């Protein structure tokens, strides 16, 4: 659908949704992809990271836009179920699994031509058996731990033995090797330079001692794309920046311009006037003190992924003005103060994330207010919230 031009004090718009909805701007997705592409070599391709339902933005819809882009190599998911869902929704490009896959998934993984990350010898043996049963090879990416301390072989003699076994295991093809930066989003670049050196040194050992040229080498995550162009290799993995969000406050915001993809809306469903001494929400943590307080109820709460930790300190936007949250955010409802917004009425638009007139509230600002961070907030906007797609080639 076309991008919605929503007037903040109108009581109806042609969205088809009223309680709450997340508007997903595909034009912003494409802008962010092109912006990242401009900061990498022309021969480097991008992996669109679509785990956790595309960081809460809707993986299937974003995947369908990515299918058209020649510079997108494929997708990355965290779980087999996520990867399978992408295939079922029409993904033709390669899909890489970044986490562990349990053996009972291996045959279907082989059938769907999903690339697993490998870092345990038993995985090699069981994937080989699955490849034989399905009658097709399994392309694997070796996970290398250069400083993250989670999954991955180490860049040492034992790791080299693992690569040797992988390249000699029937039915398996070593297509790629990747590592993950632990501190690329921090001002101190030293630890990331160390990780890059460990990766390239191990890759060179593989070339020399095993005479193996791994086709796809990738290190850079979103922060790496921005701050470490020397780590681009063959592929880069675009995660949080794909959605127009920043990896951290320490990452440059001028090298790769970004546009937020998600705007979160609701509507006022009830307004009441309260005199002094009226408690609001659970626990009575807020009590009115003014002669008259105008309280609006919004049908959104932590059951939708809107943080309860915003209780008493967050705000929403109504008619281009900030409306502070009163008391505790409930599971399904939130109350705000609209005493200073006389034009607000039942049905008026509420912006929980996004811009309204001259005011805005970003995912990063919500994170600061709630004591969380933007990755978490985006992923927590759950399936109860409809995603309304606008813009792009399919919108």
Task: Label each residue range with its predicted role.
Residues 3, 16, 20-23, 28-31, ...:
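Active-site-proximal beta-alpha core segment in soluble small-molecule metabolic enzymes
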């Amino acid at each position: 659908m076309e991008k919605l031009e929503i007037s903040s004090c109108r009581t109806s718009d042609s969205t088809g949704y009223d309680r709450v909805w997340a508007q997903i701007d595909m034009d912003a997705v494409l802008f962010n992809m092109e912006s990242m592409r401009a900061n990498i070599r022309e021969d480097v391709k991008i992996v669109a990271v679509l785990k956790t339902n595309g960081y809460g933005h809707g993986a299937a819809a974003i995947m369908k836009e990515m299918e058209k882009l020649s510079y997108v190599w494929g997708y990355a998911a965290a779980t087999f179920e996520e990867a399978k869902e992408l295939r079922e929704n029409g993904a033709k490009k390669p899909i890489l699994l970044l986490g562990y896959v349990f053996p009972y998934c291996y045959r279907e993984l082989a059938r769907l031509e999903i690339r697993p990350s490998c870092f345990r010898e038993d995985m090699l043996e069981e994937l080989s058996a699955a490849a034989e049963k399905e009658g097709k090879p399994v392309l694997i990416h070796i996970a290398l731990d250069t400083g993250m301390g989670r999954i991955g072989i180490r860049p040492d003699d034992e790791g080299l033995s693992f690569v040797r076994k992988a390249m000699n295991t029937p039915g398996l093809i070593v297509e790629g090797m990747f590592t993950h930066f632990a501190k690329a989003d921090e001002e101190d670049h030293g630890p990331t330079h160390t990780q890059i050196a460990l990766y390239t040194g191990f890759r060179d050992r593989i070339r020399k001692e095993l005479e193996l040229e791994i086709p796809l080498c990738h290190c850079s995550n979103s922060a790496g794309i921005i701050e470490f162009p020397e780590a681009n290799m063959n592929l880069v993995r675009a995660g949080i920046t794909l959605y127009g969000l920043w990896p951290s406050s320490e990452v440059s915001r001028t090298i790769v311009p970004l546009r937020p993809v998600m705007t979160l809306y609701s509507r006022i469903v009830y307004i009441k006037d309260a005199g002094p001494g009226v408690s609001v929400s659970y626990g009575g943590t807020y009590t009115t003190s003014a002669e008259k307080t105008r309280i609006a109820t919004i049908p959104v709460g932590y059951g939708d992924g809107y943080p309860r930790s915003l209780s008493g300190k967050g705000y929403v936007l109504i008619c281009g003005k900030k409306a502070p949250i009163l008391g505790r955010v409930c599971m399904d409802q939130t109350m705000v103060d609209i005493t200073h917004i006389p034009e607000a009425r039942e049905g008026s638009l509420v912006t929980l994330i996004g811009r309204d007139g001259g005011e805005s509230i970003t995912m990063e600002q919500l994170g600061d207010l709630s004591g969380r961070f933007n990755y978490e907030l985006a992923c927590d906007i759950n399936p109860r919230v409809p995603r309304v797609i606008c813009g792009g080639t399919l919108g």
